[in-house]
A protein has these predicted regions:
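Flexible, solvent-exposed loop/hinge segments and secondary-structure transition points
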Residues: 2-194
Length: 194
């Protein structure tokens, strides 16, 4: 006996599924277009707040174009328009991925503050890099050889020593590398007269 192929049994579910997929795609496109602006505005607001956190004496910030860096460093200006420092975003590889750090450096070469913008380190270990007690270790004049990590119980370097987070030396090294990269960019910017 020959079985008959019924086109209605195939076309109807296929058409229904296609219509559902088109409606869902349209809904996602509308949602994306509606939320894209507010999300961008929130990101800009968060970045400005982070800049203010790492260089609180600044009244405004001005991006420095064409530095060859992946993120544009910013001049920090006081209310009179004088440069009081620079805000530089850098990153380095940590244990759980990239650690993105924003560093504020005053014109005299003193780190005014750092904040961790992004990290995916282990909770309770490497994620402690966001704690103020760790970040405050960087609040000093940038040493000639940059910052370096030492473990608790070891002799701290004379200057520029950053005590590693307990059981998170890789993360500690990542933050130090990112801050050291920011200090290198700072040195380049200040030599160039920016």
């Amino acid at each position: 006996m020959k079985s008959k192929f019924n086109w209605k049994e195939v076309i109807r579910p296929t058409a229904t599924l296609t219509i559902i997929c088109l409606l869902v795609t349209a809904a996602l496109a509308v949602t994306n277009s509606v939320t894209q602006g507010p999300i961008a505005a929130l990101a800009t607001q968060k970045e400005l707040a982070s800049r203010q956190q790492v260089l609180p004496q600044a009244a405004s910030f001005e991006e420095i174009p064409d530095t060859g860096e992946t993120t544009s460093p910013c001049k920090a200006l006081d209310s009179a328009g004088n440069v009081v420092g620079y805000v530089i975003v850098t990153s380095a590889n940590g244990y759980g991925g990239s650690v993105k750090v924003m560093t504020g450096i005053q014109t005299d070469g003193t780190v005014a503050g750092i904040t961790i913008l992004e990290q995916s380190e282990t909770v309770g270990l490497g994620a402690n890099c966001e704690k103020e007690s760790f970040r405050n270790q960087f609040l000093q004049t940038v040493p000639d050889n940059g910052f370096s990590v030492y473990k608790a119980g070891q002799n701290a370097p004379e200057n520029g020593g950053i005590e590693a987070l307990t059981s998170a030396t890789i993360t500690s090294n990542a933050v130090v590398k990112a801050v050291n990269r920011a200090t290198e960019i700072f040195a380049t910017l200040t030599k160039g007269g920016n």
